[in-house]
Amino acid sequence: VIDGIGDQVTSAFSTNTFNKNGSNVPETGFASYVSPHRILLNVGYRLANKNGASNFGLYYEASQLGYIGNYSYSRYSYTMYVQSGNYQNAVTNDRGAVNLLYIPTRSELDGMPFTSDENKEAFWNFIQKDSYLSDHVGEYSKRGGAVMPWYHTLNFRFSQDFYVNVKGKRNTISLGLDVTNLANMLNRNWGNIKRMNTSSILAWDGTNYTFTAPKWSKYASTVSTWSAMFSIRYTFN
């Protein structure tokens, strides 16, 4: 099953057919939007008296979510880039294939030509430190096998209700404050969602391999910043 990412049929085919034997032999695996774990917590408290009521609410969510480029994922696939002409994949001979990365053993790696010994060692060190790659040495990476880091968000709501009597009926005026991503308001280093620049970490030019470590950064968007909204509401009885 293809995740459906892409605004055109051709882009969905060329960028989402993760495999090791060509696009006509697609790999089964986890969809990119399936989060292994998700935690939701909603707490509310209401303090009322004859003149009105104070309402407090906290909403907490934690899930494994991040970005690659401008698309959000819960899972991602480690892949290898093949430099070839006319968009032809030199490994699978397939225009639409995205090569799943083979994770070599130490002995296999020693026999692979790299642009430099330092680059080869950097690749091995990355494998050893990565929780997914280190558990699958000697195998192909799975489609959607790697999981994004945890993302935490905390939202806060406060509203104050004032009761007013209109012709013997109790109406309510409510003043509200909603803060989205409260943690980020308290500390700019909290409540940030991370972005990975690429999951294609190995390149083959027909002669040598080149390893490029992925870079993580803050995803500069509204999901990584706090916001506040004031509201007023009148409720008729």
Annotate each language-model stretch with its function.
Residues 1-72:
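Gram-negative outer-membrane beta-barrel transporters
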Residues 4-11, 66-85, 187-196:
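Outer-membrane beta-barrel and related beta-rich outer-membrane complex signature
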Residues 35, 47-50, 62, 162-166, ...:
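Outer-membrane beta-barrel strand-turn architecture
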Residues 35-39, 150-154, 171, 224-228:
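Residues that define the transmembrane beta-barrel architecture of outer-membrane proteins
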Residues 41-45, 156-160, 177-179, 230-234:
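Residues on the lipid-exposed face of transmembrane beta-strands in outer-membrane beta-barrel proteins
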Residues 55-167, 174, 202-203, 209-216:
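Extracytoplasmic gating/loop element in the C-terminal half of outer-membrane beta-barrel translocons
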Residues 187-237:
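C-terminal beta-signal and terminal closure region of outer-membrane beta-barrel proteins
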